[in-house]
Amino acid sequence: EKGFPYYPTDTKWRNDIFNQLVNFKRDTLIDRKNKVIGQSAHGLNLAWSYMPHAWGIKCGKMKTPMEIWEDEEHLSKGLNKILSGTFFMKKPAHMITESDMRSMLRRYSGTQMVSNFRPTAAAAMYDIFVDKESPLEGTTAGTVWDPSMGYGGRLLGAIAAGVNYIGTDPCIPTYEGLEKIRDEYGHKHLN
């Protein structure tokens, strides 16, 4: 009825998610003693909102979420799993959200979706390993080079951490999404 449950693309939603990412306390993810950077999903949905084509990208021989969506039998089985509470939290039909649908399409048996780097983890790594702009310390923002940018997680992490980011990606629809992220949230280079 509504069409595929892509992530929202409206400016207010995106700006709210971006602000949550920027304001997230990344230092809570860093466990220096055990040399571990923890996980938080902040900003991941923002990255995905620029990559609608990702739902149809094949991972080996697995079905894509888009293939499940387009197959009435599989889609019906997935919906029944939500309605009955099998594998998913049980919900009546009128309570099923687009988020529930995305989750089901990702986790449906025999299905795999491409993955993304968590922006908070990327930003935490940049916080540790890359210089920041600081007139007080006399430093300028360092630069990260990403030879295979993926779906925007590391780019958003670089923006949140305030470091320069240079990247390449061979997939045209992916690169177009990355350019939109850069144009809408990236810092303008001053030189």
For each of these PLM feature ranges, what is it?
Residues 1-43, 52, 59-191:
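Class I S-adenosyl-L-methionine-dependent methyltransferase catalytic core
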